[in-house]
């Protein structure tokens, strides 16, 4: 298999990104798909595009996708409480999401104190080397959800992870999600106002988590997600 990654920006500001793992015969289709995504994104025009292809040499770990749970009455406060994330930590996470700094990866916070535990500053932790092998989905919205579930599954597949909060930085996409090993993948509608680039990915963990091992798992271990 091959890993293919796309990153696009304008004046060093992130515009669009995507990645997957695929067989050789599918590379051309993904290259075209990611090229078109980069040059036709709602976040604006780009002046830089990076497409990177690497052969996957390490053993691939199989993960079962988090179940999708739809409940229009879900609130972030309730979900955080059910997963052991303090209200203070949740609010600290929302501060990162709503500030004007563009983080290119996830931020790891203590689920108890809200203290930032990673030391990657603006870069953040990048979840890479992943692909959704089988997905019961159709349509444009489901394609977006498929990619989000793949990321959420990887992020929540490690001991010590309590939950993850994600808000898209796309201008007109206002649906975020809250995911956890305990509650599955929960979409949160109208999580932000339209027309803003505010967004981000916050991972809430126990302070005793093996942080270096976790970051290595997210960034370097090949991961294939399947439906149960």
Curated annotation (Swiss-Prot):
InterPro entries recorded: BioW
NCBIfam families for the chain: PRK01322.1 (NF002360)
Pathway(s) it belongs to: Metabolic intermediate metabolism; pimeloyl-CoA biosynthesis; pimeloyl-CoA from pimelate: step 1/1
Residue ranges of the TM segments: none
Enzyme's top EC category: ligase
Organism encoding this protein: Staphylococcus epidermidis (strain ATCC 12228 / FDA PCI 1200)
Family: Belongs to the BioW family.
Protein name as it appears in the record: 6-carboxyhexanoate--CoA ligase
Disulphide bond pairs: none
Record text on subunit structure and interactions: Homodimer.
A GO BP entry: biotin biosynthetic process
Recorded catalytic activity of this chain's protein: heptanedioate + ATP + CoA = 6-carboxyhexanoyl-CoA + AMP + diphosphate
Function in brief: Catalyzes the transformation of pimelate into pimeloyl-CoA with concomitant hydrolysis of ATP to AMP.
Listed GO MF terms: 6-carboxyhexanoate-CoA ligase activity; ATP binding; magnesium ion binding
Superkingdom to which the source organism belongs: Bacteria
EC number: 6.2.1.14
Cofactor(s) demanded: Mg(2+)
Keywords on record: ATP-binding, Biotin biosynthesis, Ligase, Magnesium, Nucleotide-binding
């Amino acid at each position: 298999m091959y890993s293919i990654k796309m990153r696009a920006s304008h004046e060093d500001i992130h515009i669009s990104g995507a990645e997957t793992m695929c067989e050789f015969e599918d590379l051309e289709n993904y290259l075209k798909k990611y090229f078109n995504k980069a040059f036709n994104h709602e976040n604006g025009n780009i002046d830089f595009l990076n497409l990177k292809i690497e052969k996957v040499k390490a053993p691939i770990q199989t993960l079962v996708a988090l179940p999708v749970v739809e409940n229009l009455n879900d609130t972030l406060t309730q979900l955080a409480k059910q997963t052991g994330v303090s209200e203070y930590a949740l609010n600290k996470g929302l501060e990162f999401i709503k500030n004007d700094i563009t983080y290119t990866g996830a931020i790891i916070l203590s689920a108890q104190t809200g203290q930032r535990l990673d030391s990657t500053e603006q870069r953040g932790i990048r979840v890479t080397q992943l692909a959704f092998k089988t997905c019961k989905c159709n349509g444009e919205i489901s394609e977006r959800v498929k990619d989000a579930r793949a990321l959420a599954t990887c992020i929540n597949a490690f001991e010590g992870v309590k939950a993850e909060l994600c808000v898209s930085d796309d201008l007109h996409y206002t649906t975020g999600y809250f995911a956890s090993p305990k509650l599955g993948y929960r979409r949160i509608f109208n999580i932000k106002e339209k027309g803003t680039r505010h967004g981000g990915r916050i991972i809430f963990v126990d302070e005793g988590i093996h942080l270096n091992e976790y970051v290595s798992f997210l960034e370097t271990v090949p991961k294939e997600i399947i439906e149960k």
